[in-house]
Amino acid sequence: MSGPPPPVALVRTAVRRALRDLPAGSLVLVACSGGPDSLALAGATAFVAPRLGLRAGGVTVDHGLQEGSAERADTVAALLRNLGFDPVERVSVTVGTAGGPEAAARSARYAALEKTADVHQAAAVLLGHTRDDQAETVLLRLARGSGARSLAAMATRTGRYLRPFLDVDRRTVHEAASLMGFEPWSDPHNTDPAYTRSRVRHEALPVLERVLGPGITEALARTATLLRDDADALDAWADQAQQQVGRGPTALDAAGLAGLPRAIRTRLLRRIALAAGCPAGALTAEHVFALDRLVTEWRGQSHVDLPGARRGRRHDGQIIVSAD
């Protein structure tokens, strides 16, 4: 008897690899929008999970941003039940405005996924991000001047969130969804030039492919993997250094900092700023560099203004971040 078509076999293998270390009897939830990536993920999980002794459930989130979104969420929930998923949750969310429409929708979606996973005590939540999504994320963060940790982009595992398709190209995943008999929904936001990611996908990446040659998507995703390894090593070094120069959660010894490489200093300075209450999304590299100048270019200068009504200052040989 012949096996499944290659794209279907590939996505099943990717899901099997992601789930194989989970304890038997664990519940895994598939986040499904009804698009081709998440439908392929749902189909592969429906096949793989029971063969690994796992329970499969699903969750679909209605952001309420488009006409007909409620009916579409109902359709996706019914499809997941037909695949044998149990439980299946259909969650409606209210999308705010903080950080722009894409970021606000993402925040609302992840909050819903987290709550659903908590309620059902899920061991893992599966997300359908592909290698192409990874490449787009790298470009978006590169344009913001991000560091190694941010450029490392998405991990195959972040806490309970698993991304089985992160090493699989989008075309293969879409072929798998079609071969499984799904009729995916096409999100108009994915082709709307008002959204930055859409412009990267349909304008920037094709230009890079034409100018630099094929393989740019794979190269960007590979860069993310390499940078993740580097960032992990630097974070571990920073952990060790903090034990030596830390003076509580929001202060560091200035002389000890001065003897460390800049990559380690800036990590530690960012940590104390966050611990003091600076909002992560508002704390930029320039803020951290200004704190670093209190170490490397100390001339008795004044404090550094930071987001969240916080200040960084040098006092009694320490770099301290506190409220105004």
Curated annotation (Swiss-Prot):
Free-text domain note: The N-terminal region contains the highly conserved SGGXDS motif, predicted to be a P-loop motif involved in ATP binding.
Sequence similarity: Belongs to the tRNA(Ile)-lysidine synthase family.
GO molecular function: ATP binding; tRNA(Ile)-lysidine synthase activity
List of residues binding ATP: 33-38
Catalysed reaction equations from the record: cytidine(34) in tRNA(Ile2) + L-lysine + ATP = lysidine(34) in tRNA(Ile2) + AMP + diphosphate + H(+)
Physiological role: Ligates lysine onto the cytidine present at position 34 of the AUA codon-specific tRNA(Ile) that contains the anticodon CAU, in an ATP-dependent manner. Cytidine is converted to lysidine, thus changing the amino acid specificity of the tRNA from methionine to isoleucine.
Keywords assigned by UniProt, alphabetized: ATP-binding, Cytoplasm, Ligase, Nucleotide-binding, tRNA processing
Protein known as: tRNA(Ile)-lysidine synthase
EC class name: ligase
EC number per UniProt: 6.3.4.19
Predominant location category: cytoplasm
Subcellular location: Cytoplasm
